């Protein structure tokens, strides 16, 4: 869980920017999107195989 404390004399926009940066660095949002819907293990394997094939070429 990312936590951001608003500093003294810091605007809300700056604090929000720092929060967004910390969330993107930790990969929290990407992980939530990935786990939004259940994915069968066979589908996971297929996607992983296709991604490896894409990287190879």
From Swiss-Prot:
HAMAP family: Ribosomal_bS21
UniProt entry keywords in alphabetical sequence: Ribonucleoprotein, Ribosomal protein
Family of this protein: Belongs to the bacterial ribosomal protein bS21 family.
Any one GO cellular component localisation term in the record: ribonucleoprotein complex
Entry's Gene Ontology BP terms: translation
A Pfam family reported for this protein in Swiss-Prot or TrEMBL: Ribosomal_S21
Taxonomic path: Bacteria, Bacillati, Bacillota, Bacilli, Bacillales
PROSITE patterns noted in UniProt: RIBOSOMAL_S21
Domain of life: Bacteria
Organism: Bacillus anthracis
Recorded GO MF terms: structural constituent of ribosome
Stated name of the protein: Small ribosomal subunit protein bS21
């Amino acid at each position: 869980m990312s936590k951001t404390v608003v500093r003294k004399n810091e605007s809300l926009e700056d604090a929000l920017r720092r929060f967004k940066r910390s969330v993107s660095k930790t990969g929290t949002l990407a992980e939530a999107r990935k786990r939004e819907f259940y994915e069968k293990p066979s589908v996971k394997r297929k996607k992983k195989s296709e991604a490896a094939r894409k990287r190879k070429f």
